[in-house]
Amino acid sequence: MTEEEITALVIDNGSGMVKAGFAGDDAPRAVFPSIVGRPRHQAVMVGMGQKDSYVGDEAQSKRGILSLKYPIEHGIVTNWDDMEKIWYHTFYNELRISPEDHPVLLTEAPLNPKANREKMTQIMFETFNVPAMYVAIQAVLSLYASGRTTGIVVDSGDGVTHTVPIYEGYALPHAIMRIDLAGRDLTDYLAKILTERGYSFTTTAEREIVRDIKEKCCYVAQDYDHELEIASSQPAKIDKQYELPDGQIITIGSERFRCPEVLFQPSLIGMEGEGIHNVAYQSIMKCDVDIRKDLYANVVLSGGTTMFPGIADRMQRELASVAPSSVKIKLVAPAERKYSVWIGGSILASLSTFQQMWISKAEYDEFGPSVVHRKCF
């Protein structure tokens, strides 16, 4: 076998996007939406080779005639058949390799149900016959990618947001906090407040348009109430145009910052619980008093939902208002934070010291799916 053939694969299965590639690379080769689409209409043109399901970008491009489903919700796989389709697509169509030849590193949100990772392990070994695999915690990988061993990672993706304090490479499980409030909830909320403007987005395909509006137009206000005043008194300062796929142009105003505000005020969507700044603070307060200072100085943002302009400054301000006044707070927001989980996985899987950590096929055959809890943090 040549060197290229036995490279480990790193697959970061997000609720919204799959990031996949080879260990040792500095960016994922394949990034596509975690979507499986099925036709909503009857096929009339025979011989066009219509499929009964489409995955990823192809589903996205044909979304006008498909019903789109995300098999991963809040970081937990809810539809294993569709998940298998996504993995199959990843191996054979995107990376164009055969999974029997490569160890696979998968990622998972912390505090996920145990059954979720057991089933992941089972499918990898039994359906795809991988020689070895490992399941890593997403936030830990993000910290690796930022080149630190100590810090608190605030990871917010499409399905789940979590804060994980890590000290000298050890995650502190008692202080991990998780909120099921993330990008997809923001998209839903944006769709709802756009309805008040008279723009209705109802189908699964139109939801994707809203997601695009969110990614292109939204930002985090430094002072929410002040921003609302500007929006009502000088709307021209805030209004932005967006062109829909059919050429219509819509104007969005205060929605631009009202949407991401949900991260700091979940009560806007009727969710009980604290904003992400408070969750991070509580996470730090659950740690030993001696290490808090180091955590405050290394708050690492990761995940696609932390890509809003202004989020780091706002987070810094919010943390400063609750933390002791003498403490120094530093936010780290790497430019590639959308992919930092994947990058961390790529680093981890190519370390020589990591090679003994893999769960081998032999171990799986001996112990069954529960081996994953013994070998993976």
Swiss-Prot record:
It is an enzyme of class 3 (hydrolase). One of its GO terms (cellular component) is cytoplasm. PROSITE patterns: ACTINS_1, ACTINS_2, ACTINS_ACT_LIKE. It comes from Cyanidioschyzon merolae (strain NIES-3377 / 10D). This is Actin. Its EC number is 3.6.4.-. It is found in: Cytoplasm, Cytoskeleton. Disulfide bonds: none annotated. It catalyses: ATP + H2O = ADP + phosphate + H(+).
